[in-house]
Amino acid sequence: MTDKRKDGSGKLLYCSFCGKSQHEVRKLIAGPSVYICDECVDLCNDIIREEIKEVAPHRERSALPTPHEIRTHLDDYVIGQEQAKKVLALAVYNHYKRLRNGDTSNGVELGKSNILLIGPTGSGKTLLAETLARLLDVPFTMADATTLTEAGYVGEDVENIIQKLLQKCDYDVQKAQRGIVYIDEIDKISRKSDNPSITRDVSGEGVQQALLKLIEGTVAAVPPQGGRKHPQQEFLQVDTSKILFICGGAFAGLDKVIANRVETGSGIGFGATVKAKSDKASEGELLSQVEPEDLIKFGLIPEFIGRLPVVATLNELSEEALIQILKEPKNALTKQYQALFNLEGVDLEFRDEALDAIARKAMARKTGARGLRSIVEAALLDTMYDLPSMEDVEKVVIDESVIAGQSKPLLIYGKPEAQASGE
């Protein structure tokens, strides 16, 4: 089809659908003996979009993945953390099964099971939540608990979390109510003492109190443009009882709280049992024994813990696990950089000793998997900067010395006589 203002005879043209002339519209598109204006095209698009929205609920009734299928999908993207993946797969399956059956089964009301992820930084908490949302094709948003404050104080309202979720699905309330919200750094809103405070803690216990109803399930009134700045606009009513909340945090020091409980034997005085250092459990083993009382001592209020009945603990990643993360997942870091280099027509090779060196460096930094990208980026920075301006480079090889900063990557050229290193 072509865009026309006048036909060959010089006659004024009109839209065949609405009858407007070419001077009343921006564009007039010509077909065989008919014309359609841009306004009618927009109207057709709106009609189609409305029909898609009506069909969408039927598509959502497609088969829900089983816990085994969810776990298998997580295995494709997340290395290790087997117990956490099992717990998450079952919790997510039960949550969406509950939604599909209208919150009831044979007259029994099914409760909501939000999830608490406990594990060191870089252990995969955020990645697990993102991967679940991608598998289930539901809206997903992340929030940082450290930026939240009680209503009326400077900072983000907890309702802003729901507003972000609505943004992810173009303010489609029905879609948002099937979404997943991941609240990171949840350990940072612990109260400063496990005793109730006489002073107001607006970013600690106050935020926990504000999150209670949101996480448990309430009808949140959310303005489409967010915040408290537009009091006159119409509010959207979002039922948060259908939204799955996953809270995650490193909980540094929680292992010591658990150790004080589990490693002190029975008895007092001369009858007390004192465990030797060799008998003491590792941090991962201790975290797997977490109880609600430990979280209360850490600084979470009992009511908040009660809203997060499913607890999954993640272990600190070993050097071997970091090497696997570098090369095995579908979106492994080495595969991502190889794809980037392929766009330049260049192959990228990571030798095994280079992967070992990257993992060792990340372990030394204590940043877990999150630190891997910065190490690889630093090693490849100069090469990626120069490569678009270079010719005849066929391959780039990364070895241990490159990661250690002792040499530049090996560049292999198409012409054997031009082979050079570190140019």
Curated annotation (Swiss-Prot):
One of its GO terms (molecular function) is unfolded protein binding. One of its GO terms (biological process) is proteolysis involved in protein catabolic process. ATP binds at P120, T121, G122, S123, G124, K125, T126, L127. Zn(2+) binds at C15, C18, C37, C40. One of its GO terms (cellular component) is HslUV protease complex. Pfam families: AAA_2, ClpB_D2-small, zf-C4_ClpX. Residues 2-56 form the ClpX-type ZB domain. This is ATP-dependent Clp protease ATP-binding subunit ClpX. The lineage of its organism: Bacteria, Pseudomonadati, Pseudomonadota, Gammaproteobacteria, Enterobacterales.
